[in-house]
Amino acid sequence: MITIKTVNTKKELTQFVDFLYDLFDGNPNFVPPLFQDECNCLDKSKNAAFDFCQAEYFLAYNDEGKIVGRVAAIINNKANQRWQQKRVRFGWFDFVDDREVSTKLLQAVEDYGRKNGMEEIVGPLGFTDLDKEGMLTEGFDQLGTMMTSYGAPYYKEHMHAMEGYTVDVRYRETKLMAPKEVPAKYMKVGEMVQKRYNLHVYKPSRWDLIVKGVGRQVFELLNETYKDIYGYNELNSKQINQYIAQYIPFVNPKFITIIRDHNTPEKKMVGFGLSIASLSHALQKTRKGRLLPFGWWHIVKTLFISKKSPIIDLLLIGVLPEYRSKGANALLFTDLIPQYISYGCVWAETQVQLEDNANATSQWGPLDPIVHKRRECYVKTL
């Protein structure tokens, strides 16, 4: 018999996080998240999303008292208000191949939602759009990334057999093969937008990003460019500060490109591309996502010492809608691609993108895109 218990103590929260490492221990494609990042994200006193979110975490135990599953129940009041919905989200959903485990975990989230007046359950989703989204349904033989969750093939089987659940949205992840030079199409469009629209590349330093407020401008632009994407809610000032502190110090400025409109007095920021040398292999060398004793070295080596990176993760790309048709995206790539080539990039990896987001999927054409992973989010009426 499976028993579901609420996470109430720091020890139980550690067990909640550690379950994932144990479940996929030895899997060559599983990329462990950083332990402390996971704990901070789930900690109600540390994650700024709790200014407008509420959550409860559950663990599943078998008869021997062994943990066999976990799930988070999240209510994002800000997103519900923005999209005029009453949804409870489920996330951090991992379990052994036992239908009783997965069913009872989701029932716990459903009960939590009903108790709080929710009308639907949806997931896997996190607190915000920058958390991990979607359940992996294809690409189990592909290396994961630090920004996405892994999963077993039986996860999808459980969800598709679960009573009342249907697919809400589908995502894709794409592998972009690195060219030997910038594709002619990008070069042609990039030159045109500079001459015709007076749009130009700006390369910020880490000082600019952290101290001069350019990093904040990037996330404010993210809010504007992502505002109509499925389930998105704007990041508040406190969240932006957290993301700047969490990500910007570790990003190579060469992999950050900003597009500015020189027709405006302030040279308005209208687009950005933020990427990073893949940390997948470095994270796999940590002990359960811990930086100590030697996990930190593998990450530092990848980010700051090595001059080669065969895989680049495209973390975030955003262009204001009125500038997409002008070719601003192509201008981004004319700057970023030479940087990737100089680091020996073999391919770049996109993060999750909605299958019906034509603006996101159409821009990769000249880079021989290969869709190598797919994900799904599910919804059920309570």
Task: Write out the residue ranges for each language-model feature.
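Extreme N-terminal starter segment of soluble prokaryotic enzymes
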Residues: 2-3
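A conserved beta-strand-loop-helix scaffold within acyl/acetyltransferase catalytic domains
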Residues: 20-63, 71-81, 203-317
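Acyl-donor binding region in acyl/amide transferases
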Residues: 80-164, 289-366
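Short beta-strand segments
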Residues: 122, 175, 258, 274, ...
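Acyltransferase donor/substrate-recognition loop-hinge adjacent to the catalytic core
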Residues: 149-229
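A structural motif corresponding to the C-terminal lobe/cap of the Radical SAM core domain
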Residues: 366, 371-377
